[in-house]
Amino acid sequence: MPRRPIIRRALAALAAASLLAPALPTAAHATQNWPLKPIRIIVPNPPAGPSDIAIRPLAAAVQKALGQPVIVENRAGANGNIGAAEVARAAADGYTWLWAMDPVLTVNKHIYKNIGYSSDAIVVLNAAARFSQTLICNPKLGFKSVKDMIDATKTRELTYATGGAGSPGHLVMESLLSTTGVKMVHIPYKGPAPAMQDLMGGQVDCGFLAAPTVLPQIQSGRVTALATSGKQRSTLMPQLPTIAESGYPEFDGTFWLFLAAPKGVPADIQKRFLEAMEVAIRSPEQQDRVKPVDIEMVGSTADLAQQKAKELSGKWEALTRKIQLKAE
């Protein structure tokens, strides 16, 4: 076969390929120019709650740093599973992120038969903030300390209220009962407001609830605060001891707010987003904004966040197995 026709065909193929090349942007080109459109942060809780209050100024700061809108979208329901599932199914392109309390990612997979997604489809990237629960009791009981409550369980049946099965208040109370070897009867409610109402009314004895929910009632004397669950004292109630300071030094009922993403977000996109978020997290302005909801901004590397998530998952799995906790 003559060589000249072969050469002509090869040159024609090369020319065609060169014409097509500009129309086929590479993955590297797409990540280099990120973000090209608005970014979503999914919050699997209702608006105006502590986690929602914490993320909105962060989103505004990241929006300013990256030059694209950063939109907070609330997707409440099923103890956070609905919002988490939306993130798990999203494209791993850096345009969808998750901001969630740690039980959404560290507890739900152990207590729900089906959370609606594969738990390894979401990757934790920043342990952004921590918060605690406050142990309160009806003042008519006369308890002045955690020890008073624990001692009372040995002579009478006590009840405790929570915002629902698997909620932070439920987990931390069962953790305390496990630590002390005593029992109380769990009365779950559909949210903290009705739990607080019945506790004040004397229909239930005690409970663990978030500080912003309980502070006005503590100040009015309608409930008595005994301790806070975390290792650090509450910024809202610094006079209140921790449970660790109340005779149980190993106890730690700290909860976390995690920033996470669908598995597979390119490393350079992760880096840009996380750097902008970390600057916002560590700003004094952000610390001041979240103090009224008793959240402490911390921030972390991705490795440390994943280590923390793994540690908490193991801790809560052991507890939920022990108390045979299952959610519908």
Q: Positions of the model-derived regions?
A:
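C-terminal lobe and pocket-closing loops
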Residues: S118, R130, V214-S283, E311-G314, ...
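An extracytoplasmic/periplasmic, membrane-proximal ligand-sensing/linker region
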Residues: L36-P38, A267-E328
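Hinge/capping helix and adjacent helix->loop/strand transition within the periplasmic-binding protein
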Residues: R89-Y95, H110-P194, I243, W256-R289
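N-terminal secretory signal peptides that target proteins for export/translocation
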Residues: M1-I6
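Bacterial N-terminal signal peptides
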Residues: A12-A23
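Beta->alpha turn/N-cap motifs
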Residues: W99-V104, N108, P192, L209-V214, ...
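N-terminal (or domain-start) structured segment
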Residues: H29-A121, E157-T159, A165, G181-D205, ...
